Amino acid sequence: MARITSMILVAGLTLAACNQASEQRNADALNAAKNVAENAGDRIENAAENAIEALKPTPDAQDFVNLAARSDAFEIAAAKLASANATSAEVKAFALQMIKAHSESTAKIKLAAGKARPAVIPNPDLTLGQKKDLDELRQKKGAAFDEEYIDGQVDAHEDALALMRSYASGGTDAALKAAAGEIAPVVEGHLKMARALESKTDK
C-alpha cells in the first residue's frame, strides 16, 4: 500500500512539474507574440505618422517660427506645472528635462530667425487651445495629473515633430531649415520618452 501511495505521489509530482513547464512555455510564447504585435504596431504607427506628415503643407518662415515658439512656450509652461505637481519621480524628471530642452530649442529658433532672409520674429503667444489644456491640467491632482500631463506631452510632441520634419524637408529659408533639422531628432527622442511614460501613467 505504501508503495502504491509513493508511486501515486511521484506521478502527481511529475504531472505537476509537466503542467508547470507547459504553463511557462505558454507564457513565453504569449510574451513573444506580444512583442511581435507591439513591434508591428510601432511600424504601422510610424508609417501612419509619415503619411500624415506628407499631406501637411509646409508653413512659411513666419508661420513656422510662430508655431515653434508657441510649442516651446506650451511645453515649458506644462513642464513647470508638472515639476511642481507630478507624483511620479519619473514624470518630474521628464518635466525638468523638457524645461531645459525647450528653452534650448527656443534659443535655437530665435537665432535662426534672426539669420533668416528676411529676418522674422517668433511670436510665442499661446493659442486658446493651449491655454485651455493648461487650465485643465491645473485642475488635476495626484495620479490623474501625471496621466493628463503625459498624454498631453505625447500629443504635443507628435505635432512638434511633424512641424520640424515638414520645415526641415520643405522649408524655404536655409537657416530655419537647418535649425528644424537639428531639433527634429531631439523632439523624436522626447516623444519616445513620453510614450514610454504614457504606458505607465495611463489607467
Descriptions of predicted regions:
Residues 1-7:
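Bacterial N-terminal signal peptides that target proteins for export
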Residues 2, 19-203:
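His/Met- and acidic-residue-enriched segments that coordinate or traffic transition-metal cofactors
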Residues 14-17:
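C-terminal motif of bacterial Sec signal peptides marking the signal peptidase cleavage site
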